[in-house]
């Protein structure tokens, strides 16, 4: 997605050798115009998949996921990273390691929101090592639902997340694919949409 790549170049900051900070439009402050465009692109990419639910993980995946769900006209569910006292029964869980935060969390979704008839599109802000998406896939499979694809706003293609997900038989669609970081700059490779 050319518009997204241009925005990353304009407003993204490379930190070290493998961190991209995009807090001015995605991970802290949200540009809803850009998110709406992102939602439309993912909806077009999965228009024929019969998606019934969009699933993400809190927190930075929520903004793009809401706009994808809006464009597909389906509900959006986000996995919670912290146990809520109101979630007392029928909980689907998985362990997820965060590359950015360097911590493992138990994420959960109430089972009443997913059924064996659901066709799910997972949406997330970043793909690095694939652990967040893998955890969401585990939760969706616990419900007996099917994963139709994983939509990623920004993929760090130099890390092994895509390979992990494709080895699991999951279609990955990334709107911006970063080939590498070089001298504080980033290089893109061809995106999926």
UniProtKB/Swiss-Prot annotation:
One of its GO terms (molecular function) is xanthine phosphoribosyltransferase activity. One of its GO terms (biological process) is XMP salvage. It catalyses: XMP + diphosphate = xanthine + 5-phospho-alpha-D-ribose 1-diphosphate. Keywords: Cytoplasm, Glycosyltransferase, Purine salvage, Transferase. It is found in: Cytoplasm. Transmembrane segments: none annotated. 5-phospho-alpha-D-ribose 1-diphosphate binds at residues 128-132. The keyword Transferase applies. GO terms for cellular component: cytoplasm. Xanthine binds at residues 20, 27, 156. It holds the Pfam family Pribosyltran. Converts the preformed base xanthine, a product of nucleic acid breakdown, to xanthosine 5'-monophosphate (XMP), so it can be reused for RNA or DNA synthesis. Belongs to the purine/pyrimidine phosphoribosyltransferase family. Xpt subfamily. NCBIfam families: PRK09219.1, XPRTase. This is Xanthine phosphoribosyltransferase. The gene is xpt.
């Amino acid at each position: 997605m050319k518009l997204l790549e241009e925005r990353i170049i304009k407003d993204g900051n490379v930190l070290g050798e493998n961190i991209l900070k995009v807090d001015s439009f995605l991970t802290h402050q949200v540009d809803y115009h850009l998110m709406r465009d992102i939602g439309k692109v993912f909806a077009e990419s999965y228009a024929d998949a019969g998606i019934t639910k969009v699933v993400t993980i809190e927190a930075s995946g929520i903004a793009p996921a809401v706009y994808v769900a809006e464009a597909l006209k389906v509900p959006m569910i986000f996995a919670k990273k912290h146990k809520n006292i109101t979630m007392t029964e029928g909980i689907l869980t998985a362990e997820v390691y965060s590359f950015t935060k360097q911590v493992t969390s138990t994420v959960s979704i109430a089972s009443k929101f997913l059924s064996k008839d659901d066709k799910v599109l997972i949406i997330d802000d970043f793909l690095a090592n694939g652990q967040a998406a893998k955890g969401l896939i585990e939760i969706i499979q616990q419900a007996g639902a099917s994963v139709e694809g994983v939509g990623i706003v920004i993929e760090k293609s130099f890390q092994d997340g895509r390979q992990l997900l494709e080895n699991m038989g999951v279609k990955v669609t990334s709107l911006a694919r970063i080939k590498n970081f070089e001298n504080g700059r980033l290089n893109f490779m061809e995106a999926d949409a």
